[in-house]
């Protein structure tokens, strides 16, 4: 159902390979997951291959290469299994499904708003209630303050409430700001 929601919002599904040659899989942003990547030898080419530990770098590479000439903004969605050498405290499992969306070629704050809205709608579509999303993008909150016509004093109260994760303080804001934030 998640993929149906993102598809209905114009996100095209891409399916990166589960196994790739190491020089492709771990290039660019893929370097960040090198230590988490299972490796194996391809018996035909005698080259090292890796099982993806994160699909995001693969999708970024697809956007930059095969879809380099596609019109922007480019909206891509993906879902599939990933495998990591070891889990961590937050996610001890080594194999799990990853679902994501990427938006390339648009203003940062606008893209952030679209992605957050899409995530909220997708989670509601699968029955998640009382959703709380933590944002750490100063440009996004400033854009929200401007969009709802918030004066400087109210913007400062909103900023402090958000920093403190004070739901009552956010709810006490005037107008549309409380609903959006």
Predicted feature locations:
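Extended, charged alpha-beta segments that form solvent-exposed binding/catalytic grooves
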Residues: 1-181
């Amino acid at each position: 159902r998640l993929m149906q929601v993102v598809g209905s919002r114009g996100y095209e599904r891409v399916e990166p390979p589960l196994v790739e040659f190491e020089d492709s899989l771990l290039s660019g942003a893929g370097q960040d997951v090198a230590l988490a990547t299972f490796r194996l030898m391809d018996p035909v080419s005698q080259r090292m291959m890796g099982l993806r530990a994160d699909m995001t770098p693969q999708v970024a590479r697809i956007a930059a290469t095969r879809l380099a000439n596609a019109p922007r903004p480019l909206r891509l969605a993906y879902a599939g299994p990933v495998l990591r050498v070891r889990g961590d405290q937050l996610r001890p499992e080594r194999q799990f499904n990853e679902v994501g969306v990427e938006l390339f070629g648009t203003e940062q704050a606008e893209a952030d708003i679209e992605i957050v809205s899409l995530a909220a709608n997708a989670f509601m579509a699968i029955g998640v209630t009382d959703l709380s999303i933590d944002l750490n993008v100063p440009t996004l909150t400033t854009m929200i303050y401007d969009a709802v016509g918030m004066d400087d004093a109210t913007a400062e109260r909103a900023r402090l409430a958000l920093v403190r994760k004070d739901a009552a303080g956010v709810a006490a804001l005037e107008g549309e700001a409380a609903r959006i934030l």
